[in-house]
Design a protein with these regions (language model features):
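Divalent metal-dependent hydrolysis catalytic cores, especially in the metallo-beta-lactamase
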Residues: 2-31, 45-58, 85-97, 113-115, ...
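Conserved small/polar residues in nucleotide/adenosyl-binding loops
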Residues: 172-173
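Generic structural signal for well-ordered alpha-helices
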Residues: 5, 32-36, 78, 105
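N-terminal cationic-hydrophobic initiation segments that often serve targeting/anchoring roles
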Residues: 36-40, 82, 159-160
């Protein structure tokens, strides 16, 4: 963490969210324990939270995410990770078509956690349901999501149509 923190500061970054990939529950727990115990030791860019990119994705638009660990959202898992992280887990990305997403998103956003949508084959309606529950960010716009067609607006159509959301596009890959 210190190496990342110091390196980021040399590029002008003053704060960041360490980010995970889809992994096993146990590995993610170890990561949250490590960051939760050491985040104050950052001597460069400050750690302002923790971002989980996964594991609640679907395989079709998996990108670099490991499908072996993709699953439906679990409040029990999230609570364990949040406890291990000392409350730092403040952003998570998921696929809106997973079972239980609406309640999961509503609970997390009510608690101040930012929910992002990506790595998903969701329909427009599935994405809309997640946004109405509180999701507010689109991850990997166009790349990690179902595209727009004349018969199904998909995630891309939802990204354009639904208000009060933010789309992130990476041009560095």
């Amino acid at each position: 963490l210190r190496t990342m923190s110091d390196g980021l500061l040399t590029t002008g970054v003053t704060s960041f969210l360490p980010t995970t990939l889809t992994s096993s529950y146990e590995l993610l727990l170890a990561v949250t324990e490590n960051i939760g115990a050491r985040y104050k030791e950052a001597t460069g860019a400050k750690i302002r939270g923790l971002y989980f990119e996964g594991p609640y994705f679907t395989e079709k638009y998996k990108g670099a995410q490991n499908p072996a660990y993709m699953k439906d959202p679990s409040m029990n898992e999230f609570r364990a990770w949040q406890k291990a992280a000392n409350g730092l887990l403040n952003k998570i990305a998921l696929a809106p078509e997973r079972d239980g997403v609406e309640e999961f998103v509503r609970t997390l956003t009510d608690e101040g956690v930012t929910v992002a949508l990506g790595h998903s084959n969701a329909t427009f309606d599935e994405a809309k349901t997640a946004v109405e529950a509180g999701a507010s960010v689109w991850v990997h716009a166009y790349n990690g999501m179902r595209g727009l067609t004349h018969r199904e607006l998909g995630m891309v159509g939802a990204m354009y149509e639904l208000p009060h959301t933010y789309a992130a596009v990476s041009y560095t890959h």
